Amino acid sequence: MAPNIRKSHPLLKMINNSLIDLPAPSNISAWWNFGSLLAVCLMTQILTGLLLAMHYTADTSLAFSSVAHTCRNVQYGWLIRNLHANGASFFFICIFLHIGRGLYYGSYLYKETWNTGVILLLTLMATAFVGYVLPWGQMSFWGATVITNLFSAIPYIGQTLVEWTWGGFSVDNPTLTRFFALHFLLPFAIAGITVVHLTFLHESGSNNPLGISSNSDKIPFHPYYSLKDILGLTLMLTPFLTLALFSPNLLGDPENFTPANPLVTPPHIKPEWYFLFAYAILRSIPNKLGGVLALAASVLILFLIPFLHKSKQRTMTFRPLSQTLFWLLVANLLILTWIGSQPVEHPFMIIGQMASLSYFTILLILFPTIGTLENKMLNY
């Protein structure tokens, strides 16, 4: 029999083993679709970003007008920009759902896969932050000022670090130039780390909703999951295109239609919606260094999740108490997101502080405790 080129060619063999003949569990649900959706998001962002970069000028006197020029005068420039801006939102929607799936079904027990995933999240957050600064509107400028200023809370080296980040004594032209360079570079770093993420995943194979070994019951990735992924893609593309074409500025801040002005501070400085939960945690502590540490901890806590797993069962499928706690955490994050968008005044401050406290309590104390309790309940 003639050798199949798909299985013998050095490059095609890799693609075949990752996307065609890959043995996959037969029972993975739609929650396992988000990995491929994230890959599509990344490719879309790189493509639209590349097209935008061709018309963008990274200079404080020209950045705002170059973006306006792209939208007005470039063929379909408005479309490319709207896809890129809203693509970022859908990227975060998918990554949050992907992480939520990992938490619910105990996928974090594949430690290397989980840790590279958290690194991917951090890189994505950095990329989105520097990208938001590029249009050089009011919220771009003041967002950059507020967030970079947080580095000054680091003892001893803080102030030096901030001025080094800025390339001067305030957010100015050097800052914009380096942020553009970083925004161009980081997505390719994300693509590279994604390959590492997948390499680790394919060492063990996918987890599944039951959390038990699926070695005895595998099906080929293609055609089953390749088709399922295309269905998932069309289901994501529908709301994405609806948003980008019908209300492209729904998730943006109106303040960003005003060119950056260092002499006028906007009444409410707030980041894009996907950072609001962390921003609320930052603001809930009335001390600069404390706030910065809480902000960092709100995301870095994900690295600890594998060590806080105390249950004898991997997934939450058959653990109603942990399920309740999980959805409590989701509700808590929604409250934090809402608080992050509100001004710092009563009653929002106290709600934010309570939500921040419960966020860390649920993850660090309640999850391991309930896991241990459920183990004990198995004996009765």
Swiss-Prot record:
Keywords in alphabetical order: Electron transport, Heme, Iron, Membrane, Metal-binding, Mitochondrion, Mitochondrion inner membrane, Respiratory chain, Transmembrane, Transmembrane helix, Transport, Ubiquinone
Record localization: Mitochondrion inner membrane
Annotated heme b b566 binding sites: H98, H197
Textual note on the cofactor: Binds 2 heme b groups non-covalently.
Cystine crosslinks: none
Membrane topology according to the record: Multi-pass membrane protein
GO biological process annotation, one example: mitochondrial electron transport, ubiquinol to cytochrome c
An example Gene Ontology molecular-function term: ubiquinol-cytochrome-c reductase activity
Binding-site list for heme b b562: H84, H183
Residues passing through the membrane, by range: 34-54, 78-99, 114-134, 179-199, 227-247, 289-309, 321-341, 348-368
Main location: mitochondrion
Gene Ontology CC: mitochondrial inner membrane; respiratory chain complex III
Cofactor: heme b
Family affiliation: Belongs to the cytochrome b family.
Assembly behavior: The cytochrome bc1 complex contains 11 subunits: 3 respiratory subunits (MT-CYB, CYC1 and UQCRFS1), 2 core proteins (UQCRC1 and UQCRC2) and 6 low-molecular weight proteins (UQCRH/QCR6, UQCRB/QCR7, UQCRQ/QCR8, UQCR10/QCR9, UQCR11/QCR10 and a cleavage product of UQCRFS1). This cytochrome bc1 complex then forms a dimer.
Name recorded for this polypeptide: Cytochrome b
